[in-house]
Amino acid sequence: MALAKAASINDDIHDLTMRAFRCYVLDLVEQYEGGHPGSAMGMVAMGIALWKYTMKYSTNDPTWFNRDRFVLSNGHVCLFQYLFQHLSGLKSMTEKQLKSYHSSDYHSKCPGHPEIENEAVEVTTGPLGQGISNSVGLAIASKNLGALYNKPGYEVVNNTTYCIVGDACLQEGPALESISFAGHLGLDNLVVIYDNNQVCCDGSVDIANTEDISAKFRACNWNVIEVEDGARDVATIVKALELAGAEKNRPTLINVRTIIGTDSAFQNHCAAHGSALGEEGIRELKIKYGFNPSQKFHFPQEVYDFFSDIPAKGDEYVSNWNKLVSSYVKEFPELGAEFQSRVKGELPKNWKSLLPNNLPNEDTATRTSARAMVRALAKDVPNVIAGSADLSVSVNLPWPGSKYFENPQLATQCGLAGDYSGRYVEFGIREHCMCAIANGLAAFNKGTFLPITSSFYMFYLYAAPALRMAALQELKAIHIATHDSIGAGEDGPTHQPIAQSALWRAMPNFYYMRPGDASEVRGLFEKAVELPLSTLFSLSRHEVPQYPGKSSIELAKRGGYVFEDAKDADIQLIGAGSELEQAVKTARILRSRGLKVRILSFPCQRLFDEQSVGYRRSVLQRGKVPTVVIEAYVAYGWERYATAGYTMNTFGKSLPVEDVYEYFGFNPSEISKKIEGYVRAVKANPDLLYEFIDLTEKPKHDQNHL
């Protein structure tokens, strides 16, 4: 049932603002004949309710720590956000900047989707469903900080996250995962506002979706409020937002019925989604609204006056909060100092000393070594918030004394309990939203949180769009991906991620790390914490040898290094990750046959690429020595470093780990034969050094054997 219409407030100025706003949107889209006008025109009443009456923010200090967060999940409607930033007094959002929308201006602050680099934009949105998932992360961040640091009379963190979604967002997988999870957690500091215009790119929404959205949210433990005339009724939307703010124990959906392209010739038509109306259509609407049809890009002074009190109000918010924090620090010196460090985005100064240096000498899976790093760091570093997609039993990240971030009212059948002060999250089987939520945590305030996720490596493919968005936004998280390569063994090809390495190695602003033993795990984990960007660790389930005195904590941080040297080498072997073992054993056989063999360990291509030219040349010796990479992944990407590869060129197989390596020819005896032949071929024809040779044959085992 819809919320009863609220008593009118400021109807005349609301109406003037909405009319002028719609015309301004149309002018901006028309100037370069491109953009998304329709939803921005239909959502103006929502914007007035949020920016004028509800949200707590500062236009003079857009990064104020305790501000309410606003996320436009339907990012194509960015003109809506830019225009309200302009009206509310954000200094960087000038009329000139507004006019740069869809222009050729390299320095435009009005890109086609909101981007985190620009002021007052919390997260980059565009791929639908990401923004609402990020919003859950932002809400978790606030809940966690409040539970850890708030004291009676000192609510130093009490902000709300507001997120606008459209019909399309609510059809995307990560959104559905996040809606379910937010309801489960009872995040009452999250308010999602649904721009329900029932129109999509291809027509009306019912061509593909006829579900009851409100019923779905209620089933997911959301408080649901419905507003009938969302295109015009500012007062009722304000009332709905007030009710959302009063709700305890549940997030709120405000289902606002709007009209795409309101009052224009393409009202309620899919053409309003992403097309310019045309000069004649704009002229007709301006005349209908009582405006001068020849006047473009114009807000009446009364509209600016209506929003003019917002900067001063924001200054007051910031001043009062600073005074509160100052008193808080005096009242709680130790906790206050920690809180101030979190606000600055600082890790404890001693964090490196927390990482274990007593590394194993016996065969150990790299996932086990990584687990030791995470546990040691998380135990005493409050910035760390870690979790898994229902694989905690396998990845085993919870540290001694860890508390679960959980709805405090939840009583689980298995006895697991927690509250909002916990820092270990059970995400359920929701890999995509797990990583998108990690982005929200990272974006809350850079450095305040260090999100660490974990799952089987194969399942990070479900989360690829979220990891790409982390890279795009330069957000920092660490992802612990276990059961890599064909080492997942009996689980078979569905769980053996033989092709994913190429994706992550190619991703800009992203570090893919595949350590070969515990020393490399130690060095690379330290490096990952230092880096400002996201990292994915590719880790073995099976045990691998340790190489004290050969593998190097410090050299691993350089991405690639000389593991075993040889003067005037006949062949170089690159070992990566768990296949470093194959390189070492193959080298022994080749040496026994009279070849001089150099071994390179290569756990991270991007780190290696960042080294000096001199260092890279000293390690690789390109053009001088034939170089074979040995890795149980596809070869794509290794052409830049090696001249040949013993790699995977087919999907995996369900066999015990030793047998699956044998099945695909990953045994030193077989590899050494291929490499020996390759060395002879290169000596006979040196031109082979200048093309990449695949030394792997597809398995020829009898498929008909019963």
UniProtKB/Swiss-Prot annotation:
SUPFAM superfamilies: Thiamin diphosphate-binding fold (THDP-binding), TK C-terminal domain-like. It comes from the Eukaryota. Binds 1 Mg(2+) ion per subunit. Can also utilize other divalent metal cations, such as Ca(2+), Mn(2+) and Co(2+). Binds 1 thiamine pyrophosphate per subunit. GO terms for molecular function: formaldehyde transketolase activity; metal ion binding; transketolase activity. InterPro entries: THDP-binding, Transketo_C/PFOR_II, Transketolase-like_C_2, Transketolase-like_Pyr-bd, Transketolase_BS, Transketolase_CS, Transketolase_fam, Transketolase_N. Keywords: Magnesium, Metal-binding, Methanol utilization, Peroxisome, Thiamine pyrophosphate, Transferase. One of its GO terms (biological process) is methanol metabolic process. Its EC number is 2.2.1.3. It is found in: Peroxisome. A motif (Microbody targeting signal) lies at residues 704-706. The active site is at residue 431. It catalyses: D-xylulose 5-phosphate + formaldehyde = dihydroxyacetone + D-glyceraldehyde 3-phosphate. Thiamine diphosphate binds at residues 76, 126-128, 197, 273, 431, 459. GO terms for cellular component: cytosol; nucleus; peroxisome. The keyword Magnesium applies. Transmembrane segments: none annotated. Mg(2+) binds at residues 167, 197, 199. Its cofactor is Mg(2+); Ca(2+); Mn(2+); Co(2+). The record marks 36, 273 as: Important for catalytic activity. Involved in assimilation of formaldehyde. Belongs to the transketolase family. This is Dihydroxyacetone synthase. The gene is DAS1.
